[in-house]
């Protein structure tokens, strides 16, 4: 959920009321033209201009301010910033202060809480993990990792001398979207057995087919990519 808020002139500010009227009117008109509902926040603007705030709700229903768009008629004048207009006269430009994410750390925190660590494939730090059952499959597991990496995916191998059930459980708890298991049959057939972190068994498929599947999951940009 995204909430939009229009923050207007604070008590302590720079610039004339005329400039503030123009700036506030411009932002309100932009919101109205876009058909976006918004709340008015009197007195919450920056000292140099009004702003539109984009606030996000996390999984607990808390509201966090993230992106902002501020319209500033004042600082260009104070900085003596000018441009030559079509009639060859010098005019002061209008400055837009745009923060797409706001605080980067806060935005990452919201994403982590929203997805509860189970990032969709396009966002997951590790998109797929390749696990061998015995040492005999280690070389093929590394080949699969290299193939996926060369295709632009974030994949890694887990070649530890642990039971496959232990590896699957561990990477499921780490919420890696796709778990690839390689045994003797997979080496013989040059395939991978694909599971999701939710426990769904997608069966065996050639590495190229899985790469296509993962590419489609990434392109969807959402949780449904593991369904």
UniProtKB/Swiss-Prot annotation:
Entry GO CC: cytosol
Ribosomal protein listed as a keyword: no
Record-linked Pfam families: HGTP_anticodon, tRNA-synt_2b
InterPro entries, A to Z: aa-tRNA-synt_IIb (IPR002314), aa-tRNA-synth_II (IPR006195), aa-tRNA-synth_II/BPL/LPL (IPR045864), Anticodon-bd (IPR004154), Anticodon-bd_dom_sf (IPR036621), Thr-tRNA-ligase_IIa (IPR002320), ThrRS_anticodon (IPR047246)
Chief location category: cytoplasm
Segments for region (Catalytic): 1-120
Keyword Transferase: no
Localization (cell): Cytoplasm
Catalyzed reactions: tRNA(Thr) + L-threonine + ATP = L-threonyl-tRNA(Thr) + AMP + diphosphate + H(+)
Molecular functions per Gene Ontology: ATP binding; threonine-tRNA ligase activity; tRNA binding
Entry keywords, A to Z: Aminoacyl-tRNA synthetase, ATP-binding, Cytoplasm, Ligase, Nucleotide-binding, Protein biosynthesis, RNA-binding, tRNA-binding
Gene3D superfamilies assigned: Anticodon-binding domain, Bira Bifunctional Protein, Domain 2
EC number: 6.1.1.3
GO aspect biological process, one term: threonyl-tRNA aminoacylation
Quaternary structure (record): Homodimer.
Function: Catalyzes the attachment of threonine to tRNA(Thr) in a two-step reaction: L-threonine is first activated by ATP to form Thr-AMP and then transferred to the acceptor end of tRNA(Thr). Also edits incorrectly charged L-seryl-tRNA(Thr).
Family as reported in the entry's similarity comment: Belongs to the class-II aminoacyl-tRNA synthetase family.
Descriptive protein name: Threonine--tRNA ligase
Protein species of origin: Pseudomonas syringae pv. syringae
Gene name of the encoded protein: thrS
């Amino acid at each position: 959920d995204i909430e939009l808020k229009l923050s207007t002139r604070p008590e302590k500010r720079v610039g004339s009321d005329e400039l503030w009227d123009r700036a506030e009117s411009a932002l309100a008109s932009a919101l109205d033209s876009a058909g976006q509902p918004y709340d008015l926040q009197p007195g919450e603007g920056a000292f140099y201009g009004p702003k539109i705030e984009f606030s996000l709700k996390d999984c607990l229903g808390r509201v966090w301010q993230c992106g902002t768009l501020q319209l500033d008629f004042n600082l260009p004048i104070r900085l003596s910033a000018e441009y030559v207009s079509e009639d060859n006269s010098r005019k002061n430009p209008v400055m837009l202060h745009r923060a797409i994410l706001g605080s980067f750390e806060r935005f990452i925190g919201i994403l982590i809480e929203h997805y509860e660590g189970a990032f969709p494939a396009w966002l997951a730090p590790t998109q797929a993990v390749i696990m061998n059952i015995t040492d005999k499959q280690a070389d093929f597991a590394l080949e699969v990792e290299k193939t996926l990496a060369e295709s632009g995916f974030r994949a890694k191998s887990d070649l530890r001398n642990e039971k496959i059930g232990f590896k699957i459980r561990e990477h499921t708890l780490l919420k890696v979207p796709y778990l690839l298991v390689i045994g003797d049959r997979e080496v013989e057939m040059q395939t991978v057995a694909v599971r999701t972190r939710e426990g769904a068994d997608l069966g065996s498929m050639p590495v190229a087919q899985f790469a296509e599947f993962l590419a489609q999951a990434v392109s969807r940009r959402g949780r449904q990519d593991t369904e």
